């Protein structure tokens, strides 16, 4: 989790956990992170009738065909995306950002905050398992390899299964 004040509040969750119904989600959601995980979560939550806004640190989203398709779906659902936003703090009823470039402070009222940024792979955990079963070939796929999209994870899992 990113280290910001309020990150440990009870209404702050990992976006994938919310998408899998593993935690309670309110009606007005701020998603922190506009990468594939954040955009996928925005599609999921807006499809459930939630009001969603995505906040991203970088100035522009896009690049891959998958991202462009997610952005198209979000536009259809009227999901707002705010770029150039650095998360400053999380409160009970809002999130606070600094607008990069202007230094302005911006607040967004919400009842749920979903984190889709700051993901890191845990390859050291995989390496520990390799030593437990040295005769077994271990394949690393999905976010265990590096933060990536669900499509890439499925492709890697498929390739690993073929090699087993």
Task: Indicate where each model-derived feature is located.
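Helical element adjacent to the flavin cofactor pocket in flavoenzyme catalytic cores
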Residues: 71-78
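Residues that recognize and position ribonucleotide moieties
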Residues: 80, 88, 106-108
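Generic cytosolic/nucleocytoplasmic N-terminal low-complexity/intrinsically disordered segments
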Residues: 49, 76, 91-93
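Conserved N-terminal Rossmann-fold NAD(P) cofactor-binding segment
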Residues: 69-70, 94
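Short, conserved active-site loop motifs that form the nucleotide-linked donor/cofactor pocket
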Residues: 12, 78-80, 85, 138
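A conserved short coil-to-beta-strand element within the FAD-binding core of flavoproteins
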Residues: 1-2, 83-94
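Rossmann-like dinucleotide/flavin-binding elements
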Residues: 1-65, 98-164
């Amino acid at each position: 989790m990113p280290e910001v004040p309020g990150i440990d509040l009870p209404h702050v969750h990992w976006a994938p956990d919310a998408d899998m119904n593993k935690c309670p989600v309110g009606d007005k959601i701020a998603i922190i992170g506009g990468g594939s995980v954040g955009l996928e979560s925005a599609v999921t939550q807006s499809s459930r009738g939630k009001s969603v806004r995505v906040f991203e640190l970088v100035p522009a989203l896009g690049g891959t065909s998958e991202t462009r398709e997610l952005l198209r779906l979000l536009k259809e659902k009227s999901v707002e995306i705010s770029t150039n936003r650095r998360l400053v703090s999380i409160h009970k009823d809002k999130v606070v950002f600094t607008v990069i470039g202007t230094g302005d402070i911006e607040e967004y009222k919400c009842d749920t905050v979903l984190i889709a940024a700051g993901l890191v792979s845990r390859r050291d955990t995989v390496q520990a398992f390799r030593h437990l079963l040295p005769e077994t070939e271990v394949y690393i796929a999905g976010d265990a390899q590096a933060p990536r999209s669900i499509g890439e994870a499925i492709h890697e899992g498929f390739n690993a299964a073929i090699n087993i």
